[in-house]
Amino acid sequence: VFYKDAPAGKVQWGLSGVHNQMNALAAIAAAQHVGVAPAEAAQALSRFQNVKRRMELRGTAAGIQVYDDFAHHPTAIRTTLDGLRQQVGAQTRILAVFEPRSNTMKLGTMKSQLPWSLESADLAFCHTAGLDWDAAQALAPMGARAQTAGNIDSLIAQVLQAAMAGDVIVCMSNGGFGGIHDKLLQALAVRG
């Protein structure tokens, strides 16, 4: 962290992505505005524990990490995946599993932005139940990198077929996503 063109502190935390960096800088600026030194604010941020459903590690099975994230529209999906890519590097595969569950996503208002939002993922799996639009068609620009399924069990089967040790799976929805996180972890543990 720089303040008045000089180093003022360093934030070391497990959060990734430009959006979290911007939030941290805003917090440091707000703290400075009320009299907290930037170095002290940076040190405090280093102790910050992220909130639930924001790149929350739900578990690891068969060498595969499974995360939960609240991302539920293309910009949030893109931000989450770009941050994860920045964190894990180019060699680690990212499997994005998402449920377009918000009202605007169910209606297909932003469906044309989905391929763009998923660019940082190596593979994408879309749960299509309840949609008023053709997700496979919307994701067609991604080619074989995108798959769709109308129910959770089929979606899990697709992910299991693709997932390998060392991969990172991030499940994104603004709801409970049918308990997919625990179901994936159990299925991965059984599969080995």
Report each predicted region and the residues it spans.
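Acidic-glycine-rich active-site phosphate/pyrophosphate-binding loop
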Residues: 1-10
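ATP-dependent carboxylate-amine ligase
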Residues: 6, 16-19, 25-192
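Histidine-centered acyl-transfer/condensation active-site motif
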Residues: 13
